[in-house]
Amino acid sequence: MTNIRKTHPLMKILNDAFIDLPTPSNISSWWNFGSLLGLCLIMQILTGLFLAMHYTPDTSTAFSSVAHICRDVNYGWFIRYLHANGASMFFICLYAHIGRGLYYGSYMFQETWNIGVLLLLTVMATAFVGYVLPWGQMSFWGATVITNLLSAIPYIGTTLVEWIWGGFSVDKATLTRFFAFHFILPFIITALAAVHLLFLHETGSNNPTGIPSNMDMIPFHPYYTIKDILGALLLILTLLALTLFTPDLLGDPDNYTPANPLSTPAHIKPEWYFLFAYAILRSIPNKLGGVLALLLSILILIFIPMLQTSKQRSMMFRPLSQLLFWTLIADLLTLTWIGGQPVEHPYIIVGQLASILYFLLILVLMPTAGLIENKLLKW
């Protein structure tokens, strides 16, 4: 008699995705982040659900309801900080996952990659609308500044901004709709993640060498299930350490002041995971130009498969490309740092240079390095 997991219509899908899935025998820990992102998503949905049970999306009570969750609800402070720091862990895993894809040429699976870029944009949108919900100073002014960027769109910009706000400023209507978006988006992310996985399983996983994986495959379970559990435990350990020892490490103190439309914080800045894009936005002294650079800094990922010039898929055996890749990582860290600094002398020019270098590396230097490496190998 055949095992039920291979015959039952539902079990068969799960079996083919997580148990009998043929997986390359040599994938490293960089391949752990996919499952960790799934874990993050589940954690965020669960903690978010419990927070939504006690939260009120209304300008007069939103801030108080978050304070009520932290003070009066059993383990409310824990759920709230798990959710806030869980978002940071989510982005750490996301950026590691994307970095892995860039380094090992996983972007050559174009459908999987494009759904991945769409997922990144959706997660960023979710995090942005979620940050507005506690209705602190940074929530309010962050929402005002970022939504206002749409007014840079010629002709329809101002109308579009007022349509999103539901009025002439960020107010009650804005908060209510942002809560609605924040509730629905994670389920859209879940659906997109399923499609992401569907496309991945059409081709099978890439591996560090970049050569076809079908040479040597092993079943996903038990080899990679145990490896994923180790990764999950490390993720949970890090998240718990962050949540229980320094819950406010990554937050902004301004968000502990209730939103006040009459007083602007000294430095308006987003959460750390958006700082690199914020630095690129600020480095261009023109509203429309800045908005376009901001969009392009993320959407550039879509064009990466087209910029592949090397005949080798992975960077594993390409020292020149490796050097440029790590320069890109250093550049992104520099941009993240600059995004959190005030707009004054040394920071402005450093931000502008780092922004130029970011686009130069991806659009010019890395494709050129690929061609040089082909020549060096007499290809």
Swiss-Prot record:
It is found in: Mitochondrion inner membrane. Heme b b566 binds at residues 97, 196. Its main location: mitochondrion. It is a multi-pass membrane protein. The chain crosses the membrane at residues 33-53, 77-98, 113-133, 178-198, 226-246, 288-308, 320-340, 347-367. Its cofactor is heme b. CDD domains: cytochrome_b_C, Cytochrome_b_N. Binds 2 heme b groups non-covalently. Keywords: Electron transport, Heme, Iron, Membrane, Metal-binding, Mitochondrion, Mitochondrion inner membrane, Respiratory chain, Transmembrane, Transmembrane helix, Transport, Ubiquinone. One of its GO terms (biological process) is mitochondrial electron transport, ubiquinol to cytochrome c. InterPro entries: Cyt_b/b6_C, Cyt_b/b6_C_sf, Cyt_b/b6_N, Cytb/b6-like_sf, Cytochrome_b, Cytochrome_b_C_euk/bac, Cytochrome_b_N_euk/bac, Di-haem_cyt_TM. A ubiquinone binds at residue 201. Pfam families: Cytochrom_B_C, Cytochrome_B. Heme b b562 binds at residues 83, 182. GO terms for cellular component: mitochondrial inner membrane; respiratory chain complex III. GO terms for molecular function: metal ion binding; ubiquinol-cytochrome-c reductase activity. Heme 1 (or BL or b562) is low-potential and absorbs at about 562 nm, and heme 2 (or BH or b566) is high-potential and absorbs at about 566 nm. The cytochrome bc1 complex contains 11 subunits: 3 respiratory subunits (MT-CYB, CYC1 and UQCRFS1), 2 core proteins (UQCRC1 and UQCRC2) and 6 low-molecular weight proteins (UQCRH/QCR6, UQCRB/QCR7, UQCRQ/QCR8, UQCR10/QCR9, UQCR11/QCR10 and a cleavage product of UQCRFS1). This cytochrome bc1 complex then forms a dimer. Component of the ubiquinol-cytochrome c reductase complex (complex III or cytochrome b-c1 complex) that is part of the mitochondrial respiratory chain. The b-c1 complex mediates electron transfer from ubiquinol to cytochrome c. Contributes to the generation of a proton gradient across the mitochondrial membrane that is then used for ATP synthesis. Belongs to the cytochrome b family. This is Cytochrome b.
